[in-house]
Amino acid sequence: MNHPATSGEAPDVNGSGRLSLGDPVVLILSIGFIVAFLALSLYDVTLVADSISKGFAWTALALGSYFQLLLLLTFFIAMGLAITPAAKAKIGNLDAPEMSTFKWLSIILCTLLAGGGVFFAAGEPVYHFIVTPPAFSSEAGTPEAVSNALAQSFMHWGFIGWAVLGSLTAIVLAHAHYVKGQPLQPRTLLYPLLGERLMRGPLGGIIDACCVIAVVAGTVGPIGFLATQVSFGLHEVFGLPNSYTSQLVILAVLASMYVLSAMSGVHKGMQLLSRFNVFLALAVGGVIMLFGPSLFLFNSYLSSMGVYISEFFPMATITAETAPAWWMQWWTVFFFAWFIGFGPLVAIFVARISRGRSIREMIVAVAVLAPIATTVWFTLLGGSGIYYQMTGVIELSEALNNFQFDVATLTVAQALPGGAWMTLAILVLTTIFVATTGDSMSYAIAVVGAGHDDPSPYMRAFWGIAMAIMAAVLLYMGAGQISALQQFIVITAIPVSFILLPSLWDGPKAAYAMAREQGIID
């Protein structure tokens, strides 16, 4: 395994042992953020929530269009690059992949689907069904609204969001690290622009810390919400207590799962969890298609994909000038900023697990196949929710107008074939989705601290435990602080977006450089 050997490399915990937790600037700023957020929340929870809410609203209004443009450009440049001869270049100095295609795709899908697969797949399409999105004029709650509702969900969790997670940025990082010997850190994305002063000085650590903080904010949210969702589900279905103690037990089980998985590495726990989850998701989907409203779901998927494609640009470019500002803030801009916040660290992870794959394989997997799988999953759960809402089996209007997506998920699950058993299966599926995000992000943060792709298992465990503790403290204060932390990722997307920006031109340059080095092009 090729580790970087430049003088700008972050401290190697495995080699020197000088720093057990990696780059001191990244460590101090990232842990400082966690401590400061918790301390300020304990001191004045309302002040913190209100301050984040104001920053969230300003960011969405002032920079929402910029975020949308960044995602669009990333997707189309990546797609253009994928059809060039340079896309034949192999990643990571390996001629053959380290793992099978199924294992590789399973890890990619499970790692990145947690936010959507867990909390929005059942509820978001139903919400857009009962509250017509501004890009459409169909009457809410009618058959004409079905395709539009699903298409809007596809836009939020589809091609352009996924593309920013591991296409152009992953190419830049893979070339810089595995070929040029630069550290596997977000700062490396800016190396072509700022040079050695960035790699050697504290500015590089600040850049890395911004990306770590964004991922912590984005990962702690699902971890905390999972505890509330599973606790609520077990109470509703099996009558178990829905209390803070129950949430702590669920958190402990979840943290044990993803910490042990992260410590065992990509080829052991991480891929085993992902494979199991994919098999379980296929089983759940099979039951829904066999015994649920299968014809409705099949027809809805086809028509919704048609609407998604035909209305792609109107949905992708709608702004607060033509849509209600609150809607843009809480939907399109929120999700796009979420993807941006995760971008650099997920790109590190994708670059690591894609060694031996071609650039074309990586782009197609991340920006095409994974989004298509996501749209299928949203149709299975959300489409079923729409069907049961239309036929009067369930009533989610009040819950969704109050953004109670945990209630929506459980309500839809209980209406599906299998009743309590299906609900239990979806709760298990939900838990493993979050665990696969927890283990991959614990690993990715540790990689940032170490600067290479084999960080100490103890560093991985440290970050996994730190995020679980943060979730536990925030749950003690109330689920509102988890929501506030999730809103904070929109604010962190500001610096992270500028870190991603140079990849629009550096990604193709790196791909062509790799292709020339491998003799694919002249």
Model-predicted segments: where are they?
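C-terminal membrane-solvent junction of multi-pass transporters and transport-like membrane proteins
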Residues: 19-29, 87-106, 295, 299, ...
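Membrane-embedded translocation segments of transport machinery
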Residues: 198-206, 211-357, 364, 369-423
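Hydrophobic alpha-helical segments of multi-pass membrane transport proteins
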Residues: 33, 66-82, 281-292, 373-383, ...
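Membrane-water interface regions at transmembrane-helix termini and the short interhelical loops
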Residues: 12-19, 45-59, 78-98, 149-157, ...
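Extracellular loop-to-transmembrane helix junctions
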Residues: 25-31, 58-74, 105, 147-178, ...
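N-terminal alpha-helical transmembrane segments of multi-pass membrane transport
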Residues: 2-145, 263, 286, 290, ...
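Flexible loop linkers connecting adjacent transmembrane helices
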Residues: 7-17, 50-56, 83-102, 126-151, ...
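Helix-loop-helix module between adjacent transmembrane segments
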Residues: 13-42, 75-77, 113-117, 156-228, ...
